[in-house]
Swiss-Prot record:
Signal peptide: none annotated. Pathway: Sulfur metabolism; hydrogen sulfide biosynthesis; sulfite from sulfate. The keyword Secreted does not apply. One of its GO terms (cellular component) is cytoplasm. Its EC number is 1.8.4.10. CDD domains: PAPS_reductase. It comes from the Bacteria. The keyword Cytoplasm applies. This is Adenosine 5'-phosphosulfate reductase. GO terms for molecular function: 4 iron, 4 sulfur cluster binding; adenylyl-sulfate reductase (thioredoxin) activity; phosphoadenylyl-sulfate reductase (thioredoxin) activity.
């Protein structure tokens, strides 16, 4: 299927959602990524959390573009297990270009300017400073970006398409794994012997910053452990999208 270059400005909907075959082993993910990197080249960025879905995407992307650019939003509040995983990924996929993108403010500067525990008193502001604003800077020179969202992760992600108009970042967001289940993600990881975050084996299905991540027990919502004391399940990177 020949699809013209899709930009934020000319976006008219996802051309793949009703036409691409999801019967292959990757449920359309490989074909979507092939199209994305062929279309956008170095103008597409993968914003990677290094969660379970990330490992699947990294493996697929590496087959298509081994020197792809991957950006990790390093808030300075991540678990040591996450940093350990990044080191293992660098060894496993040596050609990847991994950028550790930090916020403008250090934790000390943020504490002096706002609050010593801003994530507790105003988590939305903390997420903006340490995640959203840094990604805005990264995507300033990118036409599109890749995300590992799955439809079954949470109600806020249930309507995600392969190709999305991203109102938050005025960009195109490519989500190849929308039809994957959690079991399929883990089957792929185990089948291909991919590295993954050790915290996943300790009841952490979704892993973010230390203060805002808790283990999950007996819950169908994989994001139940994120901001568990607040009416909040998203950091803000994905909430402004319009399919």
């Amino acid at each position: 299927m020949s699809v013209p270059t899709i930009t934020y400005e000319n976006f008219e909907g996802d051309p793949f959602i009703d036409s691409i075959s999801t019967d292959d082993a990757t449920k359309g993910a490989y074909e979507i990524l092939e199209w994305a990197y062929r279309t956008y080249g170095d103008s597409i960025v993968y914003s990677c959390s290094f969660g379970a879905e990330s490992m699947v995407l990294i493996d697929l992307i590496y087959q298509i573009k081994p020197d792809a650019q991957i950006v990790f939003l390093d808030t300075d509040l991540h678990f040591q297990e996450t940093y350990d995983l990044i080191d293992r990924v660098k060894e496993h996929f040596p050609k990847l270009r991994i950028e550790m993108k930090k916020p403008d403010l250090t934790l000390e500067e943020q504490a002096d300017k706002y609050n010593p525990a801003l994530w507790k008193n105003n988590p939305n502001q903390c997420c903006y400073i340490r995640k959203i604003k840094p990604l805005e800077e990264v995507l300033g020179g990118a036409v599109a970006w890749v995300s590992g969202l799955r439809r079954d992760q949470s109600p806020t992600r249930a309507n995600t398409n392969f190709i999305n108009k991203d109102e938050r970042f005025k960009s195109v967001k490519v989500c190849p794994l929308i039809y994957w289940t959690e079991d399929e993600v883990w089957d792929y990881i185990k089948k291909h012997d991919l590295p993954y975050n050790a915290l996943h084996d300790q009841h952490y299905p979704s892993i973010g910053c230390i203060p805002c991540t808790a283990p999950v027990f007996d819950s169908e919502d994989s994001r139940a452990g994120r901001w568990s004391n607040f009416d909040k399940t998203e950091c803000g990177l994905h909430v402004a999208d319009k399919p």
